[in-house]
Amino acid sequence: MNTGMKILPLFVAAAVCALGGFSSQAGQAAERTVSPRTYYGKIGMRLASMLPRFHVLQQGLDDTVSQRAWTNLVTFYDFDHSVFLKSDLERLAAREKKLDDEVKAGNVSFGYDVYNLYVARLRERIFFATNLLARAQWDFEADEVYRIKRKDAPWPETRAEAEEHWRRRMKNEVLAQMLSRELDMEEKSRKAAARPASEKTETASEDGGAEPSPAKKSDTPEESLIKKYRQYVTVMTEPDEETVLQHYLGAIARAYDPHTDYMSPASKEDFDMEMNLTLCGVGAVLSMDDGALKIVEVMPGGPMAVDGRIKKGDKIVGVRQGDGEMEDVMWQPMKKSIQKIRGRKGTRVTLEVLPRSDPTGATRKQIELVRDEIKLEDQAATGRVERVELGGVTRKLGYVYLPGFYGTMDKKMSDPGFRSCALDVSRYLADFNSVGAEGLVLDLRGNGGGSLREAVMLSALFVAGGPVVQIRDVRTVGSLPIPPGNPIAFRKPVVVLTDRASASASEIVAGHLQDTGRAIVLGDRRTHGKGTVQSVMGMGPDKYGSTKITTARFYRINGRSTQVEGVGADIHLPSLLDSLDIGEDKLPNALPFSRILPADYSPSWNLGRYVDELSALSAARLKDDARYRKHIENVEGMRAISERTDVPLSREARKRMMAADRNLRELDDIDEEGADGDDDEAPARRPRNRRAKDDVVLDEAFRILSDLIRMTGGQEVPQPKGWWL
């Protein structure tokens, strides 16, 4: 069973701020309506039969599910409530509680009715917007704002109200592009002025005094936006019958929970590509999000991870091959976009990226990568021994960074090519024991999960026996135990580092070590909160596609689910992710937190009793740590950006805001530089990749571990009798 946090690359959610493309001429093109093929009704009936039977909720396809499906479909097309009119929704609402009955009867026409109406309204909106862009008449002195978060905004009641929204939207996008270019030039000038005179002379000498070649004329913001909206409408008005069916049946499936979905035959190919870790030549797992390719996971060892500038949660909106032109990939089918990103080993590709920290979409980075194979050794666990001084005492401490729960499922340990993260970690633990390491930091930050078997085996390195996790499906509750006679590989104190990106198998391990009193959890307030298992099931003939259904839930051995709640930190050391609007609880129709009876287990230690004292010592220490105070300022600044609901449309106010935001986003690209490097108790800088210059959270984790070792007085977990065979 695989518990990796995989996000199915399915849909293109409509109408994202600052992105798209259309021309006024295209708006006058003849409209084409789409209708279902004759056998699509049978697919709908099959889905209506499977969801109540196999989904963990065991909920019938009823009026409640119908209402959720209605909302899913309407908001899939009109994500920011800017295309449909209120009267359109009132007309569609007549069938809001009837979709369950229609699909059971083999009627899937509602999905096509919504799509065709959406296309008609979209043409009207973009025709207006592109005419406005062509006139290029803006008043950037007026005291206006643009609402950037519109998921809860009311739909416009009239066409005039809709056009007022689109006027502000175009003004916002033009202003954002204009000021972004202006700030780029100012930054370039500052850097040039700051260079030593010798460098400037050397550069001039290399130029040989020749006249610079004329630069290629850039598009104006208006020209750039017209091109984007042209592509937006082209893509959104070209879906075939199968794609529209996928959108509709997917909306019905996701009414049960966000990880349940319908996959057309073409979409199933994308899913298989993701599950087989087809990494697009740059080392990333991708999904569709508001029309862009969202970075779900940066794979260790890949070009993207080695470069370090692209983060999980960033969005790819453009691709350039070698020295060619940048091609917009917004709203394109995922398969087409991936084909552009992939390529021969050693070739160059430039990605245009929207940083995760900018909800306005105004900031774009162009990052060149060289395509390469993913090096398996770079995906593996890494470890080292750190010498940490605290209070005049220097200790040897072990550190293991585990990027994912990898493991070979179809080979024996003696077979060539066998891989196991638990086995790799055990080798590091043996090394730590041999050099006398007194404790361990297990770093699960950014670990999205993987093999459940490996999660159990990893826990077995620290705990002698008992259940690791409970699993509840539609029929039974069971648990996965550590095999009897298991020898503990590491018996000394452990702290586990987690963040909001730690999910699934990571949450199982962190929760188990916390529940058994074997480790103290540090990091973001809580982890991601994905506590469910999905199964992919065929629906009959290949042309019917497949469905991905949530069939079980995970529970900690204390009886609490990891769903939504995740694993809470014993000591809160926030990362920048802690300030962003991410996590299972942010997904529509997420299954709620629940609990069952605790498993039969005994604590292996009681490290939790030291949490209050450790937390007080850490707080006192960090209060006087200038580096950490700066880190917290950045976290709070990022939180303010992510919670922003509107932006000014006056030039001066917007420029001040964008300049301040830039300073914070630069700190999301690389960790903060040390501010008090003369502190002789601060652990040495330890880069986790080529670009990471500092990790204040990891530094404090080592200090907390050092305090914990002092408090336990050298105590270790007793070694059980017997051997794990």
Can you say where each PLM-predicted feature lies in the sequence?
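Metal-dependent DNA phosphodiester-chemistry modules and their immediately adjacent helices/loops
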Residues: 502-504, 545-562
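PDZ/PDZ-like domain segments forming the peptide/carboxylate-binding groove
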Residues: 75-76, 97, 111, 116, ...
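Extracytoplasmic/secreted envelope proteins and their assembly/folding machinery
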Residues: 40-48, 62-74, 81, 89, ...
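Conserved functional hotspot residues or short segments at active or partner-binding sites
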Residues: 182-196, 204-206, 218-227, 560-721, ...
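Cleft-lining beta-strand/loop regions that shape enzyme active-site pockets
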Residues: 27-31, 35-36, 49-62, 234-243, ...
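Bacterial N-terminal signal peptides that target proteins for export
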Residues: 1-11
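Extended, small/polar residue-biased N-terminal targeting/export presequences
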Residues: 61-67, 74-150, 233-288, 348-350, ...
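Bacterial N-terminal signal peptides
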Residues: 9-21
